[in-house]
């Protein structure tokens, strides 16, 4: 009897320890995980990632976030997705070469993506060394059978000569769409963009009111080719 009681005590102790450990894990809030993701992304700002080590460090936290806050399909998140986003960290080379490098023409601390609910977005960024704002337009649509994926096709690449002093950069996107840029120009003709820029896929893994985490890749099923973006909601004065 004493032996049985001893083993019962061991089992109960083990269960209590496991429950206690689970409680500790459960107390880590979504806000705390997001804060860690943001702090780590900010520490990587302006840096390339040729060996994917920075992305892998972020992905551990992203996995924890998704376990704590599972996401509905991206089609149900389009209202949240809409609006201007600031790139805290992600790829800094969009020329089709090694995405682990940093394109010297990119102003790494002023990269924005402005998403419109109607199925298009603009990448907005000042061109380093030139008095010009680049606005690359892409159209997107959900991918059947892939609930978090958007297929992207680039369509136009306008720009604005000079930097407006009275509006945030991301507001140029709506003006570009309306053909009302204050000093509009064409960086690359539309037919060249449509023929040669192609497109790709965005895997929207997390969206809320102030944070967005997405992956960009060339193929729908190639996770090894994906590159992560950590974004926060762009706001005036922020």
What do these predicted regions represent?
Residues 1-6, 14-27:
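N-terminal chloroplast transit peptides
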Residues 7-8, 53:
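Compositionally biased, low-structure terminal segments
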Residues 25-238:
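Soluble ligand-binding/transfer domains with enclosed cavities or grooves
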